[in-house]
Amino acid sequence: MWRLIIIAILFQGLVNSAMLERRKRGVDPETAMNISEIILFRGYPSEEYEVVTGDGYILCLNRIPYGKISQKTKEPKPAVFLQHGLLADGSNWVTNLDYNSLGFALADAGFDVWLGNSRGNTWSQKHINYTIKQKEFWMFSFNEMAMYDIPASVNFVLNKTGQEQLFYVGHSQGTTIGFIAFSVLPELAKKIKMFFGLAPVMTVKFSSGGLVKLGELPEFLLKEIFGTKQIFPQNAVIKWLATHVCGQVLIDELCGNFFFLLCGFNEKNLNMSRVEIYSTHCPAGTSVQNMLHWSQAVKSGEVRAFDWGSRKENMAHYKQPTPPPYKMERMLVPTALWTGGHDWLSDRKDIAILLTLIPNLIYHKEIPEWEHLDFIWGLDAPQRMFRDMIQMMHKVQYAH
């Protein structure tokens, strides 16, 4: 009992100290900004669009049409579509400083950059028939993101830019839905010049970390804890903690370690001064059904279509008693992968399996020290990944 009291007093002292420090410093304005506002705040042009999917979800798309170095021209710039991962949003690509954010780096390198936002995250919570208060809104998983969100977003970008193809960059679940979409929808796959997979995830047989431990819980218990609608949304409590608690040096370490506990450790490669910005935008929420789908993958060791829990329901959805596997061998898009040696979610053993499944793999680089978040927030990402990606895109673009 006395230990708990002492710990509570110490924690309260840390919080009070952090709040006092925050009053002195002031809150970083980016903590309260949406994606478009962050882009403008950094001195880049910003556009925002709404895209309606085939099943009625209204997604937010953000655009950086040109950079500060590569200015607006009459000639169209090659389009790049960036797709975030699980519990994330399009801000992942722009919440670091200019040179450390892939979205800005690509814009400055001469690309027309588009940031996707999956259904159910902070910026994509509209539907033509349902509201977020209705359970019907939340009846989706990464399967629907692949089958509806990606086609709608890619087609919108191509129609808007007048181009026939674009580059696709996915991180984590963003690679999963890319793999599924481009293997199941061959006409969509033809519209992808090249697929860049960062911390790719297609099997989670050997994954570890906090999210995997959560996925190991029985389905009934997950529903009992989280309900059947939304899970881990960005909310007022998280924003308050991020803006009033994260920010002081010691507290920054604690806030940063929340991400490390979920994804792996590489603390020296995270800009701790940006943690409050990351924390006020991520997690950005998803559906409980999406987490249940990942839970099924954790327990089975493979990624299949969502298991509806009964032979009858699966027959209704798939015309077979069990959910079908995704056939990666049909994904013919030229693919380049970057993986991390310390990535708990995209484990080396799972990557070894994935490498055998991709028929048109043209490049793979493992960065031994990297974990799951280095691909979007790593301090050394420009030198160890951005440069190679941009060179590869230029080579492909100008070979056409």
Curated annotation (Swiss-Prot):
Class of the enzyme per the UniProt entry, highest EC level: hydrolase
Cellular compartments annotated: Secreted
Signal peptide (UniProt feature, chain positions): 1-17
Catalysis: reaction(s): a sterol ester + H2O = a sterol + a fatty acid + H(+)
Residues that span the membrane, as ranges: none
Domain AB hydrolase-1 as annotated: residue spans: 78-378
Pfam families: Abhydrolase_1
Superkingdom in the source lineage: Eukaryota
Keyword annotations: Glycoprotein, Hydrolase, Lipid degradation, Lipid metabolism, Secreted, Signal
Enzyme Commission identifier(s): 3.1.1.13
Glycosylation sites: N34, N129, N159, N271
GO CC list: extracellular region
Tissue occurrence: Expressed by the venom gland.
GO terms of biological process kind: lipid catabolic process
GO molecular function, one term: sterol ester esterase activity
Residues at the active site: S172 (charge relay system), H372 (charge relay system)
UniProt xrefs under Gene3D superfamilies: alpha/beta hydrolase (3.40.50.1820)
Functional description taken from the UniProt entry: In physiological conditions, is crucial for intracellular hydrolysis of cholesteryl esters and triglycerides that have been internalized via receptor-mediated endocytosis of lipoprotein particles. In venom, the biological contribution is unknown.
Protein family according to the UniProt entry: Belongs to the AB hydrolase superfamily. Lipase family.
Protein's recorded name: Putative lysosomal acid lipase/cholesteryl ester hydrolase
Organism of derivation: Crotalus adamanteus (Eastern diamondback rattlesnake)
